[in-house]
Curated annotation (Swiss-Prot):
Keywords: Disulfide bond, Hydrolase, Lysosome, Protease, Signal, Thiol protease, Zymogen
Cystine pairs: 144-187, 178-221, 279-365
Record's subcellular location: Lysosome
Organism: Dictyostelium discoideum (Social amoeba)
UniProt-recorded name of the protein: Cysteine proteinase 2
Amino acid sequence: MRLLVFLILLIFVNFSFANVRPNGRRFSESQYRTAFTEWTLKFNRQYSSSEFSNRYSIFKSNMDYVDNWNSKGDSQTVLGLNNFADITNEEYRKTYLGTRVNAHSYNGYDGREVLNVEDLQTNPKSIDWRTKNAVTPIKDQGQCGSCWSFSTTGSTEGAHALKTKKLVSLSEQNLVDCSGPEENFGCDGGLMNNAFDYIIKNKGIDTESSYPYTAETGSTCLFNKSDIGATIKGYVNITAGSEISLENGAQHGPVSVAIDASHNSFQLYTSGIYYEPKCSPTELDHGVLVVGYGVQGKDDEGPVLNRKQTIVIHKNEDNKVESSDDSSDSVRPKANNYWIVKNSWGTSWGIKGYILMSKDRKNNCGIASVSSYPLA
């Protein structure tokens, strides 16, 4: 370890970095050096001599961005030098964001049945499916744009667990390799509803242990029906753009959602309730999993009574769904409300792999624009 520290510092000397703060920089060169050295040790980064200078320069820019964001003190979102601190935002978007959908033109309701229900529904102030044995541990998609597959397995794992009382980790690789006919593209992106269609047509999805993840699009589908870990009979599309609808949907289990995760603030998120004013509610590029919601601090409104509920379900063998989803607006305090969101970037990102995303703040980052959950 001491030798590695010495070699890293020696590289800095060889690059002849001056200990002077250039215009536009927020730290001295020695502060950048110390931070980068500690960061490379923490995340076990090793670079070639030709790559070192570029990664160090990117790290400094990200370090400036983090400090500028956090120093404003007007946000509940806390950024940090996480495992993505040595890549540009362009690299990050190209490598890790694999859901491509425009909520304005999305036709996910085509061929689905719409049920309008006039009813009342009282939801609890918070729910967390992790405490009900319906959420598997954090996974890591690696350098593959397969986020959509992790969102799909996550909601399917939850639905299966709540029905059978058995939590089984399901195979993302099965979806990556085999759901091309449903218009998914492996590591180059896909959609959760397309993956649900595959599971329905395929009459199941394999377990993760039988079909392990490789972070590559396989040339051959290796699905084996003897290794099926779960089946679904349909899925519910939640009313687009309504966070109350999403809250109602979350009463049934984890929900697959698409979000705008393109910003530096999401890339470098560390803790707090995430809110990004620049987020788009329609240009969505990342598939994640809502596993619950809650409120930080005092909630003086209590449970919300919802009306004008609408369900959109997948037509499949005369499926009937008794639950309903609302399209009205929330009346709870907004700034401290959050969604509990499971990501697929390992435990080094965010809050041990999770992010708390703003809830009831005009559908920030499009979290309620395209959302659905499977029926086990």
